[in-house]
Amino acid sequence: MPKQRLRALATVPRSEAERPPAGSPSVSVVITNYNYARFLPDAVTSALTQSDVDVEVIVVDDLSADDSQQVIAELAASDPRVRPILREVNGGPVAAFNDGVEAAAGRYLVRLDADDLLTPGSLARSVALAELFPAVGLVYGNPVHFHGDVPQQARIRPTGFTVWAGHDWLTLRCALAVNCITSPEVLMRTSVLRAVGGMRPLHHAHDFELWMRLARASDVGHVDGADQAWHREHDASLSATQVDVLRDLNERADAFELLFTDGQGSPADDADLLRLASAALANEAITRTTQAYVAGRGATPETDAYLEFARRLHPDLATLPRGRVLATVQRLGPQAARRSPSLFVGAVRTRVGAQRRTARRQRTGL
């Protein structure tokens, strides 16, 4: 497994990262909404109260069936910076966001779901980084996930900024084949976003594909040590609507396929990155297969589906990092694999390694 480290193009110390951007640069916050009237006021307020930037809030309602449009009208009447877009046809979150992008006037743009919020000073921190580095088209930081009441505290003092070459960041994402960004913590340079195009019609991986497309066209910045957004987890949220593992694998594969066959990048480089991502996804699928064998679920429709997926992306499974373990569990069979001490220890190490990678991602953004 590749190391989760990148050589930074540039770093900025705390003393400079804490300086607000000069001249109040303009930011468009595009809030997409469907039946979230109860959350809208908090989301809009979190954007309107941002300091050191000139904010416009574009609320795109996707033909909600609740009282969202009334709430939006009241919010717009109370502050001229709120611009409603009321869709006449329900088109889903991708179409709603793209409508907001088309209407945006800001130098920078943030996509905010109606149930999420920006932390105090979030936009100023991200904009400060982007203003220092004109080649950066994507800035992100740490999102805080919460249930219930909105948190009252957040880390608002950055410890620094880190900038990576977009191609290096993208290569690591392909090597790991995992999305490291939630969404509300992202700030995009509007000119770069419009150059690469808006979101594409993927079910759950539309944001992941967009982040990678931006990285293919620009450098990537990270606000270190600060919380950039609050992401609400609740039963109705899109992110909380559980996607089964196999569907998630397929949708990530679709995102890589769509990105690297769109003709917008270098053909040779895109082909290499697609092979890298496909191998990583296939390796993840056979890892889940071996873990299932150790848990007593080997040689089942579940593992058959994982292996079918893996072979579709990378036919020679023996060449993958987990290929030897796969051969071992298949040779032993479900019962013997479940009783194997060495396989059990290996499964524990695999799980601990995944937990460490998650913790590292939360700390470094990678």
Residue spans for each PLM region:
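A conserved acidic beta->alpha catalytic loop
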Residues: 61-70, 89, 113
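Glycine-rich, basic loop-to-helix element that forms the pyrophosphate-binding segment
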Residues: 87-104
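Cell-envelope/extracellular polymer assembly enzymes that use nucleotide-activated donors
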Residues: 25-28, 56, 209
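Short aromatic/hydrophobic "clamp" motif used to bind/position activated sugar donors
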Residues: 109
